[in-house]
A protein has these predicted regions:
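Short turn/helix-capping motifs enriched in Asx and small/polar residues
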Residues: 1-52
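Catalytic glutamate of the conserved HExxH
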Residues: 17, 175, 179-184, 188
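Sec-dependent signal peptide cleavage junction
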Residues: 34-39, 59-61, 226-229
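Stable alpha-helical elements in mature extracytoplasmic
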Residues: 36-40, 172, 176-177
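Residue-level detector of alpha-helical secondary structure
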Residues: 41, 79-83, 92, 216, ...
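Conserved small-residue motifs centered on glycine
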Residues: 45-114, 124
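Active-site scaffold of zinc-dependent metalloenzymes
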Residues: 106-174, 186-187
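Post-HEXXH active-site segment of zinc metalloproteases
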Residues: 170-174, 186-228
Length: 229
């Protein structure tokens, strides 16, 4: 599995990624604003953040990211998204996530939010749980892919990574790790196959998409550690 999905290994460096996973004419990761940019930085080790900067178009600078070797799995996944031949729009929204349905009609999901149910130990984390360590809940994010094959699709030709703007600093970073380094990253490394990039609910609870589960757990866990530093 680690041969096909190189970044499932904890020791993969962005500058040394296999050519098959990097497009020299790749698109970009585009944070919609400064808050989105800060959210992405907060998922990374402090020492790596200087290599994640925006270009004149507001996109993450691909050449700068590629110039740096990091042991961070989150850095590597972000780097591969930046090198993919797809545009990834990162959007904070506190009202609705706009999507296109199977008929091509636009609609939206409401960005609901529940405050934390505990107020101490913000970095409490139990591996294997998708719930945020902050205790925040609701409809906290959504990743949408181009096309009309799913019930919820991107409204345009870009991948949309929506994160609930009501989330705390920590909650935003954790949930971007779920959506960006889980769903969007799996979409990237499977050749843009949205059928492989979503949750597979099991009758006994849990997620049947083992690759996605592993990606989300490791990304969220690293983000929690990076935020504590």
């Amino acid at each position: 599995m680690s041969d096909k999905y190189a970044s499932l290994s904890p020791y993969v460096y962005c500058a040394d990624n296999p050519i098959k996973l990097v497009d020299p004419n790749g698109e970009q990761v585009h944070p919609a604003g400064e808050e989105e940019y800060s959210m992405i930085l907060n998922t990374l080790p402090v020492e790596d953040r200087a290599y994640v900067q925006l270009d004149d178009n507001g996109n993450i600078n691909r050449e700068l990211m590629n110039s740096h070797n990091s042991e961070s799995g989150n850095y590597d996944r972000l780097c591969q998204l930046v090198n993919d031949d797809m545009m990834y729009d990162v959007i904070l929204d506190d009202e609705k996530y706009i999507y296109k349905d199977k008929n091509g009609d636009l609609s939206f999901q409401t960005a609901t939010y529940q405050k934390p149910n505990f107020y101490t130990d913000l970095f409490k984390y139990e591996p294997g749980e998708y719930a945020l360590s902050t205790g925040e809940g609701g409809n906290l994010g959504l990743t949408l892919y181009p096309g009309t094959t799913n019930y919820f699709n991107s409204p345009d030709d870009n991948v949309k990574i929506y994160i609930n703007k009501n989330l705390s600093r920590e909650g935003r970073a954790e949930n971007f790790s779920h959506e960006g380094y889980g769903h969007a990253f799996l979409y990237c490394i499977t050749g843009h196959d949205s059928s492989l990039s979503g949750h597979i609910p099991l009758k006994t609870n849990g997620d049947g998409n083992i690759k996605l589960k592993l990606l989300i757990e490791t990304a969220q866990s690293e983000t929690v550690s990076n935020l504590k530093r």
